[in-house]
Amino acid sequence: MQKITPFLLIDGRAEEAMNFYTSVFKNAKIVDVSRAGEKGPVFSATVELDGERFILLNMGPKAEFTAAVSFFINCETQAEVDDLWDKLLAGGEPLRCGWLKDKFGVHWQVIPSALGRYLRDKDPAKSQRVMGAMMQMVKIDIAALDHAYQGA
């Protein structure tokens, strides 16, 4: 059992969020759903996204997300970055440096693992070039990061 589980208050759209998030991630499933009555709207849902559980609770319009909390997705390939970025961005807002806000207001970072490796390089010139390149991006481009890392 997961010890710490993100609990998201969704503005009256928990069922939509449940279906959306389980369609975005390839390894996703609906674990549990509680409804208000037998055929009523979803009250809460537990979903599993790539092995991590999230609880979604239907809440009124007072609940808002901020960038102070985001979910970091570690991607291995550009295809994975592109796929997750495009799906999560649908109806949302692109932000800088691999961040986006989805249509529910939840903030995500769609980041290739190569970025971390490049930024931890012992050669400060390489890591600074990569940081400079990344700061100009919205969606992260691994080839452009690699180009900056190589100094080409």
Model region roles, listed by residue range:
Residues 8-51:
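Core segments of cupin and vicinal oxygen chelate
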Residues 31, 48, 55-59, 63, ...:
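Vicinal oxygen chelate
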Residues 5, 44, 96-97:
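Conserved beta-strand and immediately adjacent loop positions that scaffold enzyme active sites
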Residues 1-5, 66-70:
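Short, solvent-exposed beta-strand edge segments and adjacent coil->beta transition regions
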Residues 38-41, 65, 104:
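Short acidic/glycine-enriched loop/turn segments that link adjacent beta-strands
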Residues 2, 51-52:
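Short, well-ordered coil/turn segments that N-cap beta-strands
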Residues 9, 72-74:
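Short hydrophobic/aromatic beta-strand micro-patches
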